[in-house]
C-alpha cells in the first residue's frame, strides 16, 4: 500500500471562503419559533478514534464493518477537525492570510480534493492520509465545547492566548439559561484536555493544578472543583497509584485540593479504593449524592492517572475483551451513574462522555488495546441508549439527543492486507525492539509513547510490529483525517443541515457541531466572541 504525502491544491483552496457573518445568519433562530424540545444531550467522544479504527473494532466484535452501536444511527456525517495551528501552517505554504474568525477558507484547514470528502477505509482505497500537521485534543475539544477554533494546547481560550481570553462553554451557558445539570465522564484524568474543555478554561492544557511545576495561575482541577463546579465529574487522576506522595512536579491534583475535595460541602466524593468494586461504588454514590443534595465526584485511575486499559484477545469466531481493574468503573457504569444523577434535574442535562484510551492505544499503535477501548465505548453507548429507552421518567427520544464522534484521528491506521480480519480475529502483534530516532512533533498528545515510538525517514517505525501485514499504522501522532459523526434522537436534523455547507459532500466542521447544539437548545447564534462573563 502506497502512502501519498500531503500536498496543497491551489485551485480548490480558492474555491470556498467562509465568512462568519453568513454563518451567523444561517444558524440564527427564526423570530417567533417555539422553544426547542431538546432538553438532554449525551455527547460521546472517542478520543483519537478514526473511521478505520471503528471498522477494525466492528470486524473484531461483529464480523462486519458496520456493527458498532452508533453506525446505524439515522444521522451520519463526517467531521473536519483542524485547528488554528493547522490552518496557519497550510496558509503559509499556500501564501494565504493566516486564520481569522471573521473570514477564512475552510478548505485550507482540510483539503477535500487531495484527501477526499469521506474517510477512506480499506486497502486500495486508502491512498492518502493527511498525517500532519493535525489538531491536538485541547483545541479540538474547544471547538466542540465553544464553537471557536483555537491554538493547539488551549482549553476554551482564544487563539493567541490573550489575557482574559476565556471562552464560555456550551455546558456553562446551558446551565445558566435553564438550570440544567452538566457533567463530564472520562477514562483519563478528569482535567485532561477533552473533558476539561467543557468545564474549565486555560491557555495551557498542561496546567493541571495550581502549583504544578511552580504554576501560579488557577489550575484546571482547581477551576473545575472550586469555580465551575459541574454537577457530575467522573474520571481518572486519583493520586493513589499515580502520585501518592503528591510530588508537585507531576500528577493531576494537589494534596490541598484532594483533601479539600474529600471534605467538600459541595461534592460527594467516590474514589478508587483497594479491593472495592468501582462500578458499584459510583452507581451507589450517585444515589447517595442525590439523597444528600450534593454534586457527584468520582475520582479513579491507576498509574499515569488513567483507568486500567482493557485488552482484546485473539479468539477467532468468539471475540473476548478482558477489562482492566474492577477498582475502576467501566465507562458504561460511569455513564449510567452520571445519567442517574443528571436525569433527576427537571431543567435537563448536558453530559460529555470520553473514551480517552483509544487515543493512547493508537499513539502506541496498539491494535489490541484500540479494539478493546472501542468495545468499551460501545458498551457505554448501549447503556446510555437503554437509559433513554427506560420507561417511567421524563427522558425519552423526543427530548434527548445522543451523538458519537471523535475529537481527531490518531495513528494513521490502514486496513486491507492480504488477509481480512474477521470476527474475533486479531493480527499478529509484536513489540519493536530498537528505535533509531525520536519522532517529530506532529500533533501527538504526548510525543514519545512509553514504548518509545519513533519515526525514521522515509519509513515509519511503529512501536508494534505486524509481521503478517494485515494492518499498518502510519504514525504515532494525530492525523488531519475526517472523523465520523453519528446522531440519534431529538434535533438530529440540526446537525444534518450543516453537511456540505463548508465542504463538499457529507462533511461538516467540528465547530458546526457546537452550532447545531446551540440552535437545538435554543441558545441562539454564537457571536464574534463569547467570553466568560460578557
Model-derived features: positions:
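Glycine-rich phosphate/pyrophosphate-binding loops
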Residues: 166, 171-172, 177-197, 525
Amino acid at each position: 500500500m502506497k502512502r501519498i504525502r500531503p500536498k496543497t491544491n491551489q485551485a480548490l483552496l480558492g474555491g470556498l471562503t467562509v465568512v462568519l457573518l453568513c454563518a451567523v445568519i444561517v444558524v440564527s433562530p427564526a423570530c417567533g419559533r417555539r422553544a426547542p424540545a431538546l432538553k438532554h444531550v449525551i455527547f460521546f467522544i472517542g478520543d483519537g478514534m478514526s473511521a478505520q479504527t471503528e471498522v477494525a473494532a466492528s470486524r473484531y466484535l461483529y464480523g462486519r464493518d458496520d456493527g458498532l452501536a452508533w453506525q446505524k444511527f439515522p444521522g451520519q456525517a463526517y467531521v473536519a477537525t483542524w485547528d488554528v495551528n493547522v490552518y496557519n501552517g497550510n496558509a503559509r505554504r499556500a501564501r494565504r492570510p493566516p486564520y481569522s474568525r471573521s473570514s477564512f477558507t475552510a478548505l485550507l484547514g482540510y483539503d477535500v480534493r487531495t484527501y477526499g470528502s469521506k474517510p477512506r477505509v480499506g486497502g486500495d482505497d486508502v491512498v492518502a492520509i493527511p498525517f500532519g500537521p493535525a489538531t491536538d485534543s485541547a483545541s479540538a475539544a474547544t471547538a466542540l465545547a465553544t464553537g471557536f477554533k483555537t491554538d493547539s494546547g488551549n482549553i476554551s481560550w482564544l487563539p493567541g492566548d490573550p489575557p482574559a481570553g476565556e471562552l464560555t462553554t456550551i455546558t456553562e451557558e446551558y446551565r445558566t439559561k435553564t438550570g440544567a445539570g452538566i457533567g463530564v465522564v472520562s477514562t483519563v484524568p478528569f482535567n485532561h484536555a477533552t473533558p476539561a474543555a467543557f468545564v474549565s478554561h486555560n491557555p495551557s492544557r498542561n496546567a493541571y493544578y495550581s502549583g504544578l511545576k511552580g504554576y501560579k495561575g488557577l489550575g484546571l482541577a482547581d477551576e473545575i472543583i472550586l469555580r465551575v463546579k459541574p454537577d457530575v465529574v467522573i474520571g481518572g487522576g486519583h493520586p493513589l497509584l499515580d502520585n501518592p506522595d503528591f510530588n508537585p512536579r507531576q500528577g493531576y491534583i494537589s494534596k490541598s485540593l484532594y483533601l479539600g475535595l474529600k471534605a467538600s460541602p459541595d461534592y460527594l466524593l467516590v474514589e478508587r479504593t483497594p479491593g472495592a468494586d468501582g462500578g458499584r461504588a459510583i452507581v451507589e454514590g450517585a444515589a447517595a449524592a442525590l439523597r444528600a443534595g450534593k454534586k457527584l465526584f468520582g475520582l479513579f485511575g491507576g498509574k499515569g492517572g488513567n483507568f486500567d486499559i482493557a485488552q482484546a484477545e485473539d479468539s477467532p469466531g468468539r471475540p473476548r475483551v478482558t477489562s482492566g481493574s474492577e477498582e475502576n468503573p467501566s465507562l458504561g457504569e460511569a455513564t449510567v451513574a452520571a445519567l442517574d444523577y443528571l436525569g433527576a434535574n427537571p431543567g435537563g442535562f448536558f453530559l460529555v462522555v470520553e473514551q480517552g484510551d483509544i487515543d493512547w492505544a493508537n499513539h502506541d499503535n496498539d491494535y489490541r488495546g484500540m479494539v478493546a477501548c472501542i468495545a468499551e465505548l460501545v458498551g457505554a453507548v448501549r447503556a446510555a441508549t437503554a437509559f433513554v429507552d427506560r420507561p417511567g421518567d421524563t427522558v425519552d427520544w423526543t427530548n434527548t439527543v445522543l451523538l458519537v464522534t471523535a475529537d481527531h484521528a490518531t495513528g494513521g491506521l490502514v486496513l486491507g492486507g492480504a488477509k481480512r480480519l474477521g470476527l474475533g480475529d486479531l493480527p499478529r502483534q509484536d513489540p519493536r525492539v530498537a528505535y533509531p530516532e525520536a519522532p517529530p512533533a506532529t500533533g501527538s498528545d504526548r510525543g514519545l509513547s512509553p514504548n518509545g515510538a519513533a519515526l525514521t525517514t522515509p519509513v515509519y517505525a511503529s512501536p508494534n510490529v505486524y509481521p503478517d501485514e494485515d494492518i499498518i499504522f502510519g504514525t504515532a501522532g494525530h492525523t488531519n483525517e475526517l472523523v465520523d459523526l453519528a446522531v440519534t434522537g431529538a434535533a438530529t436534523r440540526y446537525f444534518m443541515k450543516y453537511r456540505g455547507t463548508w465542504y463538499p459532500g457529507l462533511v461538516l466542521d467540528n465547530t458546526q457541531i457546537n452550532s447545531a447544539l446551540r440552535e437545538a437548545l435554543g441558545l441562539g447564534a454564537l457571536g464574534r466572541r463569547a467570553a466568560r462573563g460578557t
